[in-house]
């Protein structure tokens, strides 16, 4: 009997690659539900191929259009956050993959976990802003399976080990497209240039985050919650080749690394086949062809977003909520050419400076602070 899969954000980068992997594993999985924002054309193609029982469009108008397009099919079309929560909570789901981008992913994450579903988490913002709310679920083995390549690597490396055996986690960062670009030229960076990631095929927002190193900062906070490690035990190393996805140093000072080609289909597949490994679509890694691997310390003067993320995580409470919300607004402003690339961390820092931390937030607190930070960030971007 095939297992049933729900994919939130099926038209995005992780979502489309998930469906590609699922086609490779079609003897094991079937699609129960898919969701998208407003890409009706692509989700129609996905619906006709995978024949899900449910489809969700965040955009109400797009939902109406999709209903019309699929009038010859039996799939039920839902809309909005209510629709996302509904499909995240389906009892018959064997796995819910949250591949949404941004804070919109939090409520579906909470819904999936509260309903008892296993969660494949690519939406790092769920943990960044909601870590205090959902951390109790993270202690249940196999309930949250990380999709991010770095956290998926650590998840595999820690298999068979307990927290007391871990000395530190080492997250690798490519350094993005501007690793060697002088800081004084950041103000001249174009959106087109920032969207050219040297190694990974990702969506627009996460590619910009990679260019500022904010993506790695968000991943540090995510790792803190996923693996129950204090921030001083989570290090970042710049590794331009993106061959080593992460490392773990144990108390005996041995270091184990997870390596492979820069292909998101590998961690996605592991989430779908956990705890087994099967043949994948990824290219075999040939180290002799590569020839060398390089490493360097991240420059937090040149890339202050990483430092801001550490500060937000260490301050805790609602500060990571502010960090994430301000970053989303600043990145959007840059992508719409309202601010220059170098102003992204400036906006974030100014909003963080104005925040009064709530130390033990509930879901309502998180939503309220998220809204406040977005409004404040929009004000700040208008002043830059």
From Swiss-Prot:
Mn(2+) binds at residues 148, 150, 219. GO terms for molecular function: 1-deoxy-D-xylulose-5-phosphate reductoisomerase activity; manganese ion binding; NADPH binding. GO terms for biological process: isopentenyl diphosphate biosynthetic process, methylerythritol 4-phosphate pathway involved in terpenoid biosynthetic process. Coiled coil: none annotated. It is an enzyme of class 1 (oxidoreductase). It catalyses: 2-C-methyl-D-erythritol 4-phosphate + NADP(+) = 1-deoxy-D-xylulose 5-phosphate + NADPH + H(+). Gene3D superfamilies: 1.10.1740.10, NAD(P)-binding Rossmann-like Domain. InterPro entries: DXP_reductoisomerase, DXP_reductoisomerase_C, DXP_reductoisomerase_N, DXPR_C, DXPR_C_sf, NAD(P)-bd_dom_sf. 1-deoxy-D-xylulose 5-phosphate binds at residues 124, 149-150, 174, 197, 210, 215-216, 219. NADPH binds at residues 11-14, 38, 123, 125, 203. Its cofactor is Mg(2+); Mn(2+). Transmembrane segments: none annotated. Keywords: Isoprene biosynthesis, Manganese, Metal-binding, NADP, Oxidoreductase. Pathway: Isoprenoid biosynthesis; isopentenyl diphosphate biosynthesis via DXP pathway; isopentenyl diphosphate from 1-deoxy-D-xylulose 5-phosphate: step 1/6. Its EC number is 1.1.1.267. Catalyzes the NADPH-dependent rearrangement and reduction of 1-deoxy-D-xylulose-5-phosphate (DXP) to 2-C-methyl-D-erythritol 4-phosphate (MEP). Belongs to the DXR family. PANTHER family: 1-DEOXY-D-XYLULOSE 5-PHOSPHATE REDUCTOISOMERASE, 1-DEOXY-D-XYLULOSE 5-PHOSPHATE REDUCTOISOMERASE, CHLOROPLASTIC. This is 1-deoxy-D-xylulose 5-phosphate reductoisomerase. It comes from Halothermothrix orenii (strain H 168 / OCM 544 / DSM 9562). The lineage of its organism: Bacteria, Bacillati, Bacillota, Clostridia, Halanaerobiales. The gene is dxr.
